[in-house]
Swiss-Prot record:
Residue ranges constituting the Protein kinase domain according to the UniProt record: 19-270
One function term, GO molecular function aspect: protein serine kinase activity
EC primary class: transferase
InterPro entries to which the protein is assigned, alphabetical: Aur-like, Kinase-like_dom_sf, Prot_kinase_dom, Protein_kinase_ATP_BS, Ser/Thr_kinase_AS
Keyword entries, A-Z: ATP-binding, Cytoplasm, Cytoskeleton, Kinase, Membrane, Nucleotide-binding, Nucleus, Phosphoprotein, Serine/threonine-protein kinase, Transferase
Gene name, Swiss-Prot/TrEMBL: AUR2
Phosphothreonine found at: 173
SUPFAM superfamilies: Protein kinase-like (PK-like) (SSF56112)
Function (record text): Phosphorylates specifically 'Ser-10' of histone H3 in vitro. Associates with cytoskeletal structures that are necessary for cytokinesis and with the microtubule spindle. Might colocalize with gamma-tubulin and function in microtubule organizing centers (MTOCs).
Protein name in the entry: Serine/threonine-protein kinase Aurora-2
Predominant localisation class: nucleus
SMART domains tied to this protein: S_TKc
PTM-bearing positions, type Phosphoserine: 164
Keyword hit for Isomerase: no
Amino acid sequence: MLYQAASEAAQKRWTTSDFDIGKPLGRGKFGHVYLAREKRSDHIVALKVLFKAQLQQSQVEHQLRREVEIQSHLRHPNILRLYGYFYDQKRVYLILEYAVRGELYKELQKCKYFSERRAATYVASLARALIYCHGKHVIHRDIKPENLLIGAQGELKIADFGWSVHTFNRRRTMCGTLDYLPPEMVESVEHDASVDIWSLGILCYEFLYGVPPFEAREHSETYKRIVQVDLKFPPKPIVSSSAKDLISQMLVKESTQRLALHKLLEHPWIVQNADPSGLYRG
């Protein structure tokens, strides 16, 4: 079983008694996240508590194993750290970095949309994090506002690696979120790391307009708009032509023609708007 295999690989056997557990930070489909303090070091962490029964019922144990395997080996300022994990009879516990300023999704809802400076800073940070991931043969496959957190300095953190995959080849499985799916996944053809470029393009659009570009009332209509790349830029809010140019170069049906991430960092809109520190201070 994954929990035993995982724990034997861990150098330290943690238990709940190693932590002072504080307020809940959020809840998900399979459990809750709590603010916690590791007693010996006084280190503040986020403790993600998942219920085994629910994981087994939904047949997502393999997904959790993958998330743990991948995230525990990644070290990047824009990727949430997974420090370790442990389990008891009923639960699995993930010891995660605490992102003080919480979920980006809530921030976007509150603001409705972001300034170009803020959007560019976030997009550049994520491009750097994805370049790092792709260099380690990790495709994220589920970049969206709900999977991003904001750290104490205003830096963005990729938080959820549940759909990510360690790969050297092209894959065909359907995953990720409907509005963010690229044409090749909608059509169930092979895909590679360029799916993350598409998702980053969708995210950039949503940062600037407050909604994803191919949103429609019916799923079938969303699928159709994605496959046709039915990309429209509404008149409001006002967005620069340079930002639209970048988005248009990322949201290209032919995956090999999408703007490469290192080229994205050289795009005039990024160069002119993104804070080089990667921190958005407001």
